[in-house]
Amino acid sequence: MKDQRGLYYFPFPQNKRIRMYVREKDGDIWFRLWNADEPRLWDEHGWVPYGAVKRAESMYQGKKFDPGQAYDLQLALALIEEE
């Protein structure tokens, strides 16, 4: 999907108010979260390269949040390829 902010997918399909935007830059895939209920997140948090997501995964082991679901590399690549 695409809107004025760019390409996106729903990282939590049951919640259409949260979107994960994706782009390719400098040979890496970058992610940026947008939440309709917390619009300040868009301004406060910039684009995150996938490499940084992978490095941070260990901090979330055993916790409620799963970065692997939210930051879906395969889905991001498919969206970018479709574009």
Residues of each region from the PLM?
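Amphipathic, interaction-prone secondary-structure segments
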Residues: 6-29
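Mixed-charge, Lys/Arg-enriched low-complexity segments
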Residues: 34-83
